[in-house]
Design a protein with these regions (language model features):
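Short, conserved acidic/polar surface loops in the N-terminal third of protein domains
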Residues: 52-55, 63-66, 103-105, 130-132
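Pocket-edge positions in alpha/beta enzyme catalytic cores
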Residues: 39, 64-67, 97, 162
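Conserved alpha-helical substructure of the radical SAM core
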Residues: 58-91
């Protein structure tokens, strides 16, 4: 089973490299997207989990094969241009785990137009592992959406192929964001009918947080259906 922290370190070596314009990271696409009422989106490669329901396949599973390296400034310019054309007020990095390559992400948030809200969609592993990551967002126009993979550590392991104990880092990420006063919200992908245990954990992070869970939409692409059937989830 996967150790997401060790795998993040290996992935970082693969999907980032130092250049004259800072730490470059690999992206395979830049596009407008319909979510959040319209958002400029940069799709990166590589993730530290392997979710059975993940809509991204090849660029996530073969990050060495897909994408080109871009500096934070280049990504910011592309996102600003898409946002300007679509009249969007929000930007995000999707398609992968954006927290891999911390120096790149932090610089991207620093250089992008401050009027654009940066929505950080993350599985929270690295923010839960190291609380100083959450501190990087203090004073920034950032909103963090932590996507919880399952309602328990057992479901997390089944869905992500990672060791069950790493589920705690997802909850810890919420705690760290709460501690530093960062704007955040938990999202949840679950096939469980009972999420009471999770709700109790969230209430300990912040009273009322369990009422703010956003239930994620399952996009049943053929490869997703196949993966879920393989695990007897569907
Ligand atoms: S954490 Fe997100 S990008 Fe990574 S495998 Fe899971 S759904 Fe896909």
């Amino acid at each position: 089973m996967l150790d997401p922290i060790t795998s993040s370190k290996a992935l970082e070596r693969m999907v980032t490299k130092h250049g004259e314009k800072g730490l470059l990271r690999k992206y395979y696409r830049f596009r407008p997207a319909r979510f959040y009422g319209g958002i400029a989106t940069a799709d990166a490669v590589g993730c530290n989990l392997n979710c059975a329901f993940c809509w991204v396949k090849e660029p996530r599973l073969k990050p060495w094969k897909y994408g080109e390296f871009y500096s934070p400034g280049e990504v910011a310019s592309k996102l600003e241009e898409i946002a300007r054309r679509g009249r969007f007020s929000k930007v995000r990095v999707s398609g992968a785990e954006p927290t891999i390559g911390r120096e790149h992400l932090v610089e991207l948030i620093n250089v992008i137009d401050k009027d654009l809200l940066f929505i950080l969609e993350t599985n929270g592993m690295l923010i839960g592992y190291d609380e100083s990551y959450a501190r990087e967002f203090v004073g920034k126009n950032v909103y963090v959406r932590v996507a919880l993979k399952g309602a328990s550590s057992e479901e997390f392991a089944l869905l992500t192929n990672a060791k069950p104990e790493f589920y705690d880092y997802q909850i810890k990420a919420l705690e760290n964001l709460e501690k530093y006063g960062i704007s955040y919200r938990p999202a949840l992908m679950t096939f469980s009918k009972n999420i009471q245990g999770l709700k109790e954990r969230l209430e300990k992070v912040s009273p009322g947080l369990s009422e703010e869970i956003e239930i994620e939409e399952l996009m049943l692409f053929p490869h997703v259906k196949k993966e879920l059937e393989k695990k007897n989830i569907l």
